[in-house]
């Protein structure tokens, strides 16, 4: 949790420039981080019955973001010289607890605050939002059990004091060329076929406190 509090106030002065004391000032602290939530849905695949086991899973992924060009100097004609847009890459590793938690009629594993590796958060400016890409997703469970992967790229937006995220479910597609079967996962959908909203499935207070004090 990272909160920032800023306030403008006037320091009164007496006639001889000594301070007459500062009146009470109220500071409102606001969260300056964005949270990213990963959920694993307990939904067996239609044919092979693949699912996530009731064990802690390690989730690894790469968050990417293209930044705006910035002025690096002045060119020969006196104009500003802008470099090429950069690409930020943030490797993330988190773990779920082994238990499933109910939301509506479905069950999910999530990265809880007391897990071995915490869910990631990113410092965020309340005045703007940050589009990100999610790539290189790899999920592993218990030793000797399944591992899970996807080659898809997912797009999300991070914003201060808000939770973004993604819900994964298993498919029937797998690779058994190694000692551990690797099962393909996709973004989970609801009964209507719409992508599930990770932020809406659980109360935000599950992971953090009130947005301000």
Residue map of PLM features:
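Generic structural signal for short, flexible, solvent-exposed coil/loop and linker residues
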Residues: 25-27, 155-157, 169-174
